[in-house]
Amino acid sequence: YLTIVPLFHCNGWTHTWMVPAVAGVVICCRDVTARNVYHAISVDGATHFGGAPIVLNTIIAAKEDDRLPFDHTVQVFTAGAPPPAATLAKIEPLGFNVTQVYGLTEVYGPATECAWQDDLWGETEQAERAAIKARTGVAMPVLEEATVLDENMDPVPWDGESTGEIMMRGNGVMKGYYNLPEATASAASAGDTLRSTSASGSRRL
């Protein structure tokens, strides 16, 4: 696992202990450049990393001298913003499979993801492929539930258009903000569900 996300992020510092726990290897990258990323993949054998879309664009824009060959598909978690269709169209042929994830510190980092179904979407055109990969609503195992509720706390329709507040519940959801009871109260609903007040979403099947 190539560490690109800073270690003070949940995604960064959890991987530093989780990867060795399953007999994996952590490769540290102090200076995130295309040359260093390609070196970690080609020479050190990195198979996974996480990074914002800007990191993907750095790889795409690499000078020819900075590119090194590799013979495996690199799995990439990206977050912060959906990867643009143009970015996906350029980086996937280079040997990178991009998965969009969503999360925040209050839920211990990434909590939902786009669960790609190749049997359904494997032959889709690039524009539709990018739109599907921008979805990120499938709860990861640490999350009991992820849903989208309207202002009345009712689930929004599964139409992909109606928007509401993202709500999450599970073992990884924070108990509260330290010494900030008012902030905790505003972020919690029914005591055990986190209101993602900074983000809205929609639902579709």
Residues of each region from the PLM?
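Conserved ATP-binding/catalytic segment of the ANL
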Residues: T136-V138, W158-D159, E165-L205
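Residue-level signal for inorganic ion chemistry
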Residues: I41, F49-A52, T197, L205
